[in-house]
Amino acid sequence: MVLWILWRPFGFSRRLLKLERHSITESKSLIPLAWTSLTQTLSESPGIFLLGQRKRFSTMPEIETHERDSELFSPPSDVRGMTKLDRTAFKKTVNIPVLKVRKEIVSRLMRSLRRAALQRPGIKRVIEDPEDKESRLILLDPYKIFTHDSFEKAELSVLEQLNVSPQISKYNLELTYENFKSEEILRAVLPEGQDVTSGFSRVGHIAHLNLRDHQLPFKQLIGQVMIDKNPGITSAVNKINNIDNMYRNFHMEVLSGEQNMMTKVRENKYTYEFDFSKVYWNPRLSTEHSRITELLKAGDVLFDVFAGVGPFAIPVAKKNCTVFANDLNPESHKWLLHNCKLNKVDQKVKIFNLDGKDFLQGPVKEELIQLLSLSKERKPSVHIVMNLPAKAIEFLSAFKWLLDGQPCSNEFLPIVHCYSFSKDANPAKDVRQRAGAVLGISLEACSSVHLVRNVAPNKEMLCITFQIPAAVLYKNQTKNPENHEDPPLKRQRTAEAFSDEKTQIASNT
């Protein structure tokens, strides 16, 4: 039984107070007698007026405990197992705290109640009072505010200054599909205990998901939820195989939305256009693209062996570097040409459509012969990027004895940035050993390894950076007249070395 009394505290506002919650075990015949006795006692007390007994008081509720309903903003339980999205099934009414205020002070008050106000998708934090046109109701966060004592000291001070009672009332708020977050919807729909897909890679208007087997029965619903809950997304696709073909693109299925895969993305100030279904693009590599770009300075030369649509080549060309970019995929080659023109670097980038090995042993070899024969004052720094993590290490064999004649000074030897995946417990050591095995040398003392990102559990993407040793690059070595004594191999100058145990992690967006 709940007993309510109205108490007028000194000089502020009226309050409803619950005296105590009683568990009645006596005979029902005793209840009226006890009630009558308590009524007489309270009526004699000054300043206290008895209102009556209620099981629930809708406008000024009983003081609540600090126990919170963790499922308050969860969708209805009967949506569990839904495979075809029915938005109407997500309607739900919840009881939340509100604060009644005069409409003319709402703007001033809301600046001070940001912490306490309810924040839910599609829900206004201030609504009209259905019983008073001159008042407004501020919806409060039920996980933060459950009695007037839940307000912070600063908030109470503002309320008092504006002559607003901190008395909390309840309001029945109707929630719909629009008011739930994507993660809340998917958690309610998928079987309990299963992983929920709430993240994806955004490629222009396309949401690219990698669904797991247990999520496939819900794939159409998941795709539609991603479109509904992410402004600008009009198509959701799922990768249905690994990137294992010669062109580095993957087969995908459209889960929901439009079939159009022609898209435009902006990365690090540059714009790229392409058909996402026919080329490779990974938005999670934007930080890595910037990292490599920062290593080059004006006048340097870049050979991009697996250039894709240009995320390395174009930013580097913008730094007034000379770029030679290659990709075997005819679609990537087409969009690389297009994007170079789009970003106004087409005069600084020479583009090829060759196999990576043919590119290295053809155009790269020819250019290196010219570049490395220049005088010391004119020699640029030469970088070779090989971003094909599944196979790039295999292409390192193309550097063995690539050049004839007299080696250049060690400081001008080309710098290679080669990407690879590793599932080894020590991925940096693994990549060094595999790259060294292909080249026929040890790279332990003359390379650095950068951890690019975690691809999957126990699978890392890394970049090993090193200068190609003269013993590898040149077929017939003779004494270099510029160097009376060839110094031992050293770590290359432009990439930061680190220990195998403390691999630096680059965060990607």
Curated annotation (Swiss-Prot):
Q: Report the EC number(s), separated by commas if there are several.
A: 2.1.1.228
Binding locations of S-adenosyl-L-methionine: H289, D327, L328, D355, G356, N387
| Catalytic activity annotation | guanosine(37) in tRNA + S-adenosyl-L-methionine = N(1)-methylguanosine(37) in tRNA + S-adenosyl-L-homocysteine + H(+)
Q: Name one GO cellular component term.
A: mitochondrial matrix
Q: What class of enzyme is it?
A: transferase
Presequence positions on this chain: 1-57
Q: Where in the cell is it found?
A: Mitochondrion matrix; Nucleus; Cytoplasm
Q: Which UniProt keywords apply?
A: Cytoplasm, Methyltransferase, Mitochondrion, Nucleus, S-adenosyl-L-methionine, Transferase, Transit peptide, tRNA processing
Which Gene3D superfamilies does the entry mention?
Met-10+ protein-like domains, Vaccinia Virus protein VP39
All disulfide bonds of the chain are: none
Oligomeric and partner information: Monomer.
Q: What does this protein do?
A: Involved in mitochondrial tRNA methylation. Specifically methylates the N1 position of guanosine-37 in various tRNAs. Methylation is not dependent on the nature of the nucleoside 5' of the target nucleoside. This is the first step in the biosynthesis of wybutosine (yW), a modified base adjacent to the anticodon of tRNAs and required for accurate decoding.
Q: What is this protein called?
A: tRNA (guanine(37)-N(1))-methyltransferase
